[in-house]
């Protein structure tokens, strides 16, 4: 077990066995927004500072019927989220991946746990053949995680996003089965 120190200075023993994965719900919007606004989460994603609960809720309401969105919850606190967003028509075999892990839980295998469940669902329940993602080139822990699950580098998008006052590159990665 690892000790987790939360922003409110509460120490707790963390065990991955206590993380419950479940479908994301609209009433998760506030907790998800809180996580999305954390500096580490924001640094690794395309999220803007000060995202509102309303924006999160609207995004959740606009999910397609074949999209998969899950959260990881530990002792009632959302510590991760991940989703696969299915394309349509001739690309219906493709889904785009998003994943975030709460700053206090980064490096504790939560990302591995939630991504494994999501990929199992994609492979065994939705017949998704190709999963794509973009990841900032300096996000080495995320790149290693994706490689562990068979994602391969397909290219680099130069000056893909503006972050902390400068443009940053992103890799395009995909997993085929």
Place the predicted regions along the sequence by residue.
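Conserved catalytic-core motifs of GNAT/GCN5-like acyltransferases
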Residues: 4, 132-135, 147, 152-168
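Helix-loop element at the rim of GNAT/NAT acetyltransferase active sites that forms part
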Residues: 23, 34-48
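Acetyl-CoA-dependent GNAT
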Residues: 6, 26-27, 45-104, 115-116, ...
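A short beta-loop-alpha structural element at the N-terminal edge
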Residues: 19-32
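Acyl-donor-binding surface of acyltransferase catalytic domains
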Residues: 1-15
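Conserved acetyl-CoA-binding loop-helix of GNAT-fold acetyltransferases
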Residues: 107-122, 143-148
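Conserved GNAT acetyl-CoA-binding A-motif
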Residues: 122-134
